[in-house]
């Protein structure tokens, strides 16, 4: 199942007023992939639905405790929007340990600020988010996009975007090519003298 194609098909159903068809398709794709974009569209499939309705709708496809991080983050986002801080915290609890990703840490900061107003704890989570591993995203040729695109804007390659954890840059400057191969004591080659006889 190709997630971007399924999302496009579901949006077409929604725009035609065929919400049931869209939700059926999204449920099937969610079970197969667990992709966060599918959960987000499923939650927003009914135009005009309240935040509480969106949270309830996600509860139809995601059980507690969430089976994986993407499910927990989707539930937490919907719960934060509905001001249901307890549900948001429960959804992220299995993923908010020492290996929390940037997305989980950012959501935890929102929960701390929204539920308790504790700026110190919120800043602590934001500081963790800066150092945390990145979440998967649509990437192509080193570019990160919020959503899948059919063509890479960098190279023009068709179907270049992949759902994966973006490559992080090393803080260390790489050595220029060829430098590592020379021993430290080796004399540098000199150019031949122009007037050598």
Can you annotate each of these PLM segments?
Residues 26, 44, 109-110, 141-146:
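Juxtamembrane/interface motifs at transmembrane-helix termini
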Residues 24-98:
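Alpha-helical adaptor scaffolds
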Residues 3-4, 37, 70, 103-104:
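Start-of-helix register in tetratricopeptide repeats
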Residues 1-24:
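Long, internal scaffold/assembly segments composed of regular secondary structure
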């Amino acid at each position: 199942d190709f997630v971007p194609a399924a999302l496009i098909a579901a949006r077409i159903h929604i725009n035609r007023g065929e919400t049931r068809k869209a939700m059926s398709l999204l449920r099937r794709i969610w079970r197969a992939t667990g992709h966060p974009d599918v959960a987000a569209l499923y939650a927003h499939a009914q135009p005009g639905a309240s935040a509480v309705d969106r949270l309830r709708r996600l509860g139809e496809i995601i059980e507690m405790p969430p089976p994986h991080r993407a499910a927990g983050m989707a539930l937490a986002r919907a719960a934060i929007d509905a001001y249901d801080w307890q549900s948001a915290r429960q959804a992220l609890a299995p993923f908010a340990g020492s290996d929390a990703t940037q997305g989980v840490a950012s959501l935890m900061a929102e929960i701390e600020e929204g539920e308790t107003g504790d700026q110190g704890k919120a800043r602590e989570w934001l500081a963790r988010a800066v150092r945390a591993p990145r979440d998967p995203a649509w990437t192509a040729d080193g570019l990160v996009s919020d959503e899948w695109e059919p063509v890479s804007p960098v190279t023009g390659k068709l179907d270049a975007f992949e759902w994966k954890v973006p490559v992080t840059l090393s803080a260390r400057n790489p050595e220029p090519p060829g430098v590592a191969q020379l021993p430290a004591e080796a004399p540098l080659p000199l150019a031949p003298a122009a007037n050598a006889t």
